[in-house]
C-alpha cells in the first residue's frame, strides 16, 4: 500500500530527453547500507513560533515585486537581503525549519520519532472495532502515510541535493529506515482488511466526504497492487519479483550500451562537420567517433556524405544484445508479476491506479486517433525534406532514407535561420529576476497569489544560493513555501525538477494535543503545540482562522548559468535565460502552482498527487504562457536598455523551431505505442521479440516507416523502466493543454492569458482538487465539454482526434 504513496519528483520528459541515457530518480544511490555507528539525538533548541502570515506580508505588493526581482538579479541586493537573517536568534532552526534537522544526527531522531507515531497509528487501526473507530480509518491511514512521507520525501531530496556529504549520508540512513518500515507494512493484511470493513459499512461511509472516499478508494487499489490478498507463498513470490524487477531495471538503465562503441571511418568522409570536433576525434587519418555522443548526433545533422551518415545512424540505432536482453527480462518479469496479482498484463495492473485511461485499450484508441490526426503534417514535412534532397542532388528520383532526415532538417533550418535571432539575443530580455517577477505578476492576475521574498533562519537552507519565497494569497494569507535553487553548481543534477518536500494536509486538534504532550517529554523545543504538530515547518489556519493545515513546501531546482558569485563584492550582470530555459522554468512552475493551489485536507491527494496522466497538464499549459505576448509584456525587457522585447522576433524564432514538430510527434506516438505493446499480454509469449514488435509498429502506424531491420533501438528506451505502460501521458497532456489554452484562454487573444476569470475557472475546475476528484470530471469542466465527462474508450479516442498543432502556427 504505502510504497506507492510517495510521488516521484517531477523530472519532465522534455528535460530527460536532454541526456543520452535518461536515468530514473536515484533510489539508494548515495548509500547502500546503514552506518554501524550509533547516532546521538539532535540537541534541543528553542524554535521561535512561526506566524501564520509573516509580518512583512502586509507590505505593499509593489514592494514585494521590486524586491523579488532584485534578490535574483542584483548581487548587492541579495547580499543585503541575506544579511537580514542576522537579526534572528543564532540557534539553528533546522533544514526547512524542521526542528529535528539541526545536525546530521537529527535525521535519525526525526525518523525514529516519526516511526514511533506511525506504529501507534497502525495499532489503532488494527484494533478498530466500533463504528466510530472505523469512521476515522481513512484519516488515520492518511496520517500514517504523511508521517512516513515527511521523512522519505525530505530525505530523498536532501540526499541527492545537499552539498554536505555527512548530511547526505544521514538523510540516506533516515530514508532507508522508514522505507524498510513501509515494506513491512506492505506485507500486513490487517490494514487492508480493516479498510475493507470500513468501506463495506454504510454507517461509516455515509459520514465520509467526497475527498475522504477518494482517498479510501486509492488506498484500496494500492493494497490490491501490493498483492496483500494473496496466500503467503504468492506474496513472497510477489516481493521477490518486485525486487528482481528493480534490480534488472536499474541495470538496464545504467548499463545500456550500443553494439558498436565507435564509428571508425576515414576523416575525409566527415566533411561538413565542425573542424574542431573532427580534429579532436581524428587519429592517423581516421575519425573515431563515440557512438553514443553529442558529436555523433551532430554528424547526422552536418556530414555531407550519405554513406557516412548511414554508418553513424545504424550504430546509434543499434543497442547491444545485453541491453536488449535486460529489457526483455524486465518485461517478462513484469508480465509474471501482473499475472500473479490477477491482472491480464502489466499494463492492466498499472493503469488501475491513479490513471485516467484505465485500460490499455483506451490508450491505444487515443494513440491511433492522434496518429491519424498527425499523419498529414508528417507527410507534408517529409515531402519538404525529399524536395530539399532532390534539389541538392539534382536527382528527381532521389528517395529519403532514415539517415537523411536530420541532415535535411538542418539544411532547411539553416536557410530559414538567416532571419531568425539567436537564443543569446533573447537572453538579454530574460534575466532570472525579471522572469520571477513576471511569474508572480501572472499568478497575481490569474489566481490572486504572489511571491514574497522571505528571510531564512540559520540552518534553514542547504546552500547560500537558495532563495525562500512565501506564496501569499489575497484572500487566504500565507499558503505555501517555495525554495528556489536555480543556479548551476558542479554538484547539482542538470535536470530541472519540482520536489514536494511536504504536502498539504489538515492537522486535527487531537494531533495538536498529542504534540503538546510529546514536546513536554523531550526532543526539540517548539514555540507552540501547533508548531510541534508540523515539526516546526510552515503551517497556517488561514486568514479566517480555520483548521490548522501544514502548508505545501516545495523545492524548485534548476541549473541556470550564473555570471559570477552573487555574494562576492564585484559588480555583476544578472543571470539570464535562453527562451528554452524560460519555457523550462514556466513548466516547472506549473507543477509548483498545482501543489500550491491543491491544498487538500488529505496528503494522499494533495497537489500533484493526482492521476499520473493528468499531472503534466498544468505544467504543459504553462509553456503556452511563456510565449504569449501579453505575458511577456509583464517582464521581458532588455537588461541594459530597459527596452521591451519585440515580440515579432520571438514569434519568428518559435516558428522556426517548430518547423518539424509533426515528425517529432510521430516519433513520440510510436514510442508510446511501443510501451503499450511491451506491457501487453504479448510479453508473456515465449516467442515475444522486442525488435520485431518495434519495427512492426513503425511499419503499421508511422508515415516515416520502420528502422532498418538490423537495428534494435529499443535497448536505449530507458523510460520503459520508470514509466512502464504510462509513456503516453505526455502526449495525452499535450493535447489537453493545447485544448485548454484554446478553450479557456482563447489562445491568448486580446490579453486572455491574463484573465482572472479564466484563471479562476482553471483553478476551480481542475487545480484546486489535486487528486481528490474524478479527473475526467475535472477536465470536462475545464473544457466545458460533457462528451468526455464519463471517460472510457470513446473519451480517449475523442481527445486523440483533437490532435496537437504546431505552437508556432497558433494565433496569439
UniProtKB/Swiss-Prot annotation:
Residues 518-544 are annotated as: Disordered. Zn(2+) binds at residues 587, 591, 594. Its main location: mitochondrion. Its cofactor is Zn(2+). Residues 1-35 form a transit peptide. Keywords: Hydrolase, Metal-binding, Metalloprotease, Mitochondrion, Protease, Transit peptide, Zinc. Binds 1 zinc ion. One of its GO terms (cellular component) is mitochondrial matrix. It comes from the Eukaryota. GO terms for molecular function: metal ion binding; metalloendopeptidase activity. Pfam families: Peptidase_M3. The active site is at residue 588. SUPFAM superfamilies: Metalloproteases ('zincins'), catalytic domain. It is found in: Mitochondrion matrix. Belongs to the peptidase M3 family. This is Mitochondrial intermediate peptidase. The lineage of its organism: Eukaryota, Fungi, Dikarya, Ascomycota, Pezizomycotina.
Amino acid at each position: 500500500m504505502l510504497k506507492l504513496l510517495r510521488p516521484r519528483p517531477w523530472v519532465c520528459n522534455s528535460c530527460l530527453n536532454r541526456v543520452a541515457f535518461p536515468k530514473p530518480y536515484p533510489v539508494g544511490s548515495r548509500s547502500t547500507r546503514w552506518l554501524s555507528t550509533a547516532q546521538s539525538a539532535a540537541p534541543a533548541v528553542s524554535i521561535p513560533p512561526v506566524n501564520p502570515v509573516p509580518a512583512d506580508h502586509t507590505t505593499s505588493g509593489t514592494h514585494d515585486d521590486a524586491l523579488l526581482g532584485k534578490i535574483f538579479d542584483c548581487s548587492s541586493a541579495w547580499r543585503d537581503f541575506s544579511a537580514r537573517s542576522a537579526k534572528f536568534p543564532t540557534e539553528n532552526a533546522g533544514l526547512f525549519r524542521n526542528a529535528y534537522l539541526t545536525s546530521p544526527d537529527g535525521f535519525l531522531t526525526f525518523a525514529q520519532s516519526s516511526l514511533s507515531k506511525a506504529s501507534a497509528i497502525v495499532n489503532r487501526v488494527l484494533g478498530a472495532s466500533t463504528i466510530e473507530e472505523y469512521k476515522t480509518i481513512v484519516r488515520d491511514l492518511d496520517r500514517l502515510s504523511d508521517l512516513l512521507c515527511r521523512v522519505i520525501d525530505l530525505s530523498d531530496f536532501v540526499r541527492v541535493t545537499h552539498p554536505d556529504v555527512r548530511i547526505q549520508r544521514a538523510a540516506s540512513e533516515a530514508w532507508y529506515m522508514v522505507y524498510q518500515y513501509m515494506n513491512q507494512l506492505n506485507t500486513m493484511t490487517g490494514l487492508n482488511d480493516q479498510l475493507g470493513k470500513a468501506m463495506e459499512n454504510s454507517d461509516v461511509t455515509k459520514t465520509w466526504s467526497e475527498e475522504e472516499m477518494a482517498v479510501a478508494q486509492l488506498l484500496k487499489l494500492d493494497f490490491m497492487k501490493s498483492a496483500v490478498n494473496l496466500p503467503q507463498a504468492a506474496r513472497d513470490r510477489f516481493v521477490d519479483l518486485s525486487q528482481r524487477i528493480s534490480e534488472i531495471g536499474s541495470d538496464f538503465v545504467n548499463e545500456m550500451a550500443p553494439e558498436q562503441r565507435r564509428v571508425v571511418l576515414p576523416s575525409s568522409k566527415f566533411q561538413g562537420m565542425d573542424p574542431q570536433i573532427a580534429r579532436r576525434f581524428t587519429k592517423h587519418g581516421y575519425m573515431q567517433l563515440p557512438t553514443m555522443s553529442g558529436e555523433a548526433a551532430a554528424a547526422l545533422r552536418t556530414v555531407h556524405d550519405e554513406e557516412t551518415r548511414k554508418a553513424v545512424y545504424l550504430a546509434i540505432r543499434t543497442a547491444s544484445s545485453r541491453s536488449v536482453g535486460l529489457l526483455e527480462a524486465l518485461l517478462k518479469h513484469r508480465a509474471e508479476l501482473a499475472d500473479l496479482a490477477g491482472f491480464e498484463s502489466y499494463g492492466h495492473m498499472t493503469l488501475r491506479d491513479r490513471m485516467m485511461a484505465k485500460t490499455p485499450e483506451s490508450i491505444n484508441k487515443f494513440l491511433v486517433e492522434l496518429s491519424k490526426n498527425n499523419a498529414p503534417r508528417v507527410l507534408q514535412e517529409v515531402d519538404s525534406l525529399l524536395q530539399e534532397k532532390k534539389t541538392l542532388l539534382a536527382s528527381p528520383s532521389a528517395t529519403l532514407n532514415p539517415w537523411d532526415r536530420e541532415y535535411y532538417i538542418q539544411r532547411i533550418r539553416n536557410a530559414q535561420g538567416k532571419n531568425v535571432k539567436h537564443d543569446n539575443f533573447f537572453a538579454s530580455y530574460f534575466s532570472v529576476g525579471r522572469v520571477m517577477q513576471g511569474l508572480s505578476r501572472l499568478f497575481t492576475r490569474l489566481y490572486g497569489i504572489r511571491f514574497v521574498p522571505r528571510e531564512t533562519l540559520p540552518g534553514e537552507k542547504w546552500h547560500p544560493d537558495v532563495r525562500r519565497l512565501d506564496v501569499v494569497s489575497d484572500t487566504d494569507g500565507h499558503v505555501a513555501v517555495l525554495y528556489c535553487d536555480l543556479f548551476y553548481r558542479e554538484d547539482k543534477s542538470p535536470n530541472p525538477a519540482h520536489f514536494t518536500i511536504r504536502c498539504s494536509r489538515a492537522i486535527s486538534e487531537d494531533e495538536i494535543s498529542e504534540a503538546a504532550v510529546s514536546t513536554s517529554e523531550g526532543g526539540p523545543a517548539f514555540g507552540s503545540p501547533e508548531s510541534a504538530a508540523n515539526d516546526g515547518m510552515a503551517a497556517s489556519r488561514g486568514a479566517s482562522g480555520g483548521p490548522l493545515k501544514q502548508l505545501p513546501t516545495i523545492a524548485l531546482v534548476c541549473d541556470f548559468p550564473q555570471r559570477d558569485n552573487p555574494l562576492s563584492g564585484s559588480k555583476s550582470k544578472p543571470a539570464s535565460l535562453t527562451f528554452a530555459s524560460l519555457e523550462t522554468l514556466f513548466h516547472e512552475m506549473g507543477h509548483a502552482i498545482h501543489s500550491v493551489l491543491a491544498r487538500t485536507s488529505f496528503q494522499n491527494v494533495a497537489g500533484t498527487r493526482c492521476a499520473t496522466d493528468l499531472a503534466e497538464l498544468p505544467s504543459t499549459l504553462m509553456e503556452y504562457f511563456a510565449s504569449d505576448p501579453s505575458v511577456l509584456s509583464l517582464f521581458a525587457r532588455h537588461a541594459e536598455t530597459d527596452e521591451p522585447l519585440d515580440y515579432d522576433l520571438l514569434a519568428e524564432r518559435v516558428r522556426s523551431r517548430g518547423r518539424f514538430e509533426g515528425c517529432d510527434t510521430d516519433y513520440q506516438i510510436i514510442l508510446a505505442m511501443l510501451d503499450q505493446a511491451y506491457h501487453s499480454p504479448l510479453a508473456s509469449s515465449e516467442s515475444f521479440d522486442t525488435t520485431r514488435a518495434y519495427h512492426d509498429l513503425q511499419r503499421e502506424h508511422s508515415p516515416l516507416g520502420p528502422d532498418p531491420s538490423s537495428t534494435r533501438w529499443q535497448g536505449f528506451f530507458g523510460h520503459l523502466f520508470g514509466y512502464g505502460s504510462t509513456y503516453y501521458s505526455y502526449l495525452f497532456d499535450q493535447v489537453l493543454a493545447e485544448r485548454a489554452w484554446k478553450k479557456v484562454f482563447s489562445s491568448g487573444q486580446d490579453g486572455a492569458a491574463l484573465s482572472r476569470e479564466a484563471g479562476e475557472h482553471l483553478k476551480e475546475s481542475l487545480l484546486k482538487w489535486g487528486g481528490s476528484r474524478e479527473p475526467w470530471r475535472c477536465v470536462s469542466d475545464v473544457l466545458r465539454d460533457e462528451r468526455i465527462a464519463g471517460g472510457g474508450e470513446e473519451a480517449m479516442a475523442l481527445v486523440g482526434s483533437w490532435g496537437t498543432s504546431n505552437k508556432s502556427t497558433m494565433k496569439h
